[in-house]
């Protein structure tokens, strides 16, 4: 006898299929050392994958380019990994002007995937040892912070102004309470359910739910930022409010030598691929600013 599947079971199965597909998609942002190095090798580039220990966590980063040039460190958003920046890392224009670095933020990629670090300050302190090492080789350092990477870049500049000479903020999640929360994030907050979701999404959700508190704690640091800033965001950003966040940045960055705000018509939150050329252009401009 044929039985109808109860609606809640059907919806559960459908949800699981969707989540599995999302998980498969997200894994393209987390590639092994071998796969990452192969990507660059096929382009005739000699990249390096390295690890260091910070606060008991092994942190992975990639580097490529000439030590005699200035440096750019790319800090990704959520959910993601350093592999989201592969195209930028392989860009011939950027490599002509700088040695390029990209990091797996704590909780992502191969920096303890699934083990969340929701504190912006702790993430900043875990990245600082890499910047200290970069500073030994490079006189100038520009940091690119995309989405959730934006406030981490700001916190690093507040904690260690000697380690950053310029910042590019891409669709930065910096204004408390000005981010979108999606329905799918709610079940990921339930301990018994979170284990069925991709670890990358769970970490992103943990960060999201702590973000307002963390951004409020960051508020006193903004006035201490004294490096040039380039701010880029899409006018159709569906995650970070494009109407209020640029004004927040302008009001808080009161002591920077320069602040350029670029709003892109018809552009949504995700910038790294669709705005590749603009990011390259503005990173090169920032390098010239800080020379």
Label the model's feature ranges.
Residues 267-276:
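Catalytic histidine-centered segment of alpha/beta-hydrolase-like enzymes
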